[in-house]
Amino acid sequence: MYLGIDPGKTGAMAVLDKGGEFVEVVDFEEVLPRIRLLAKTVKFAYLEEVHAMPGQGVSSTFTFGENSGWWKGILQAFEIPFKTIRPQDWQKGLVPKRGKLTEKPGLEVARQMFPMAPLNLKKHHNRADALLIARVCHQREGA
């Protein structure tokens, strides 16, 4: 299994099988019980790298960093090998550039790649990001 993780406050974890096929996507609040069950089968995980963004408040920047640290701790505790990946690196070649990269094109791409994934709503852009990160993880770390 391969994991893609969007560590945002409303982030998600996506799971792909060894063939790169969709298994599930789990919202942040529900992750801990799922990762306990999956940990032994995970080959590799990619965690989106976080950094302060212009216009982002101090509190939200802190929360974003705190969530990233939480994820790193969970992955290490369950002995899941992982790397961090910059948004530009996982988006390259997957998300079409329309001026500035936005979350909506990523959602559209993920819906096409993973039609069985629950990505019905616009607010599911974090799930979409996690799926695309998992896709890159599978491509780079798989077989």
Where are these regions (language model features)?
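Phosphate- and other anionic-substrate recognition elements at nucleic-acid/protein interfaces
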Residues: M1-A143
